[in-house]
Amino acid sequence: MNFENIPEYVNWEDEIPVIQYKALTDTGCVEHGFSTRLGGVSQGIYKSMNLSYTRGDEKGAVDENFRRFCDRLHMDWQKIVSTDQTHTANVRIVTKADEGHGISRPKSFFDIDGQVTDVPGLPLITYHADCVPLFFVDPVKKAIGLTHSGWRGTAARIGRNTVETMQKAYGSRPEDIIAVIGPSVCQNCYEVSEDVARAFMEGFRISDRLVYAKGGGKYQLNLWEANRQIMVDAGIKAEHITVTAWCTACHPDLLWSHRKSGSDRGSLAAFLMLK
């Protein structure tokens, strides 16, 4: 299939579906993708493409899932640098010394929800099952960032922190950065309490598009719009931002969702690597 004019698409090559983005492919300097729940070897509640070692799945199955998915993306799965996600706004500068962190060797850093690097051939990943993956590519300075942004990370503006870390570490200019807000829970599926909604009523441009009051102290929160605002405020051009159309909770046949399945599920992952 020709994806030349499609901003976001599911590439079904080799029966391992990958969600990809024209804007990132067009930079010519990265490999990237977002996994689905299909194309792996895990069984039971993890069937079939589970990419988490922490959910109770067999390690050998998760290893094979990583190998299969990374082969599709022309990445070495044993070099992956994994986050240690605790819903922070912390961003780490990743170097070659971090190769294999959390995948082929034990974790050595913790409480990290975002990563940046300028090292070619070093795959970054973040884990997801409703929270927002944020991709950042600077094709000028040849630097990348990948971030996990749940409501806490979004309220703390981890997307801005990622851009600022790329500026300081690599001299990136925000106006050069190409960004993607990836598959995650949509506003219609994301009901939150008033205390969570309140965190977004201060400091964001408020509209029904961001926080919609449905009554009874419940609100519908749009993390896609919140992160888009954060990116624009950080200096990324609006035309350089692609926003997903894939809601994890709306598509339980294709994507893992904590809102839909609770803890009885696998995990998705976002992948980004400089060529």
Give the ranges of each region predicted by the language model:
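Active-site microenvironment for binding and transforming phosphate-containing groups
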Residues: M1-K275
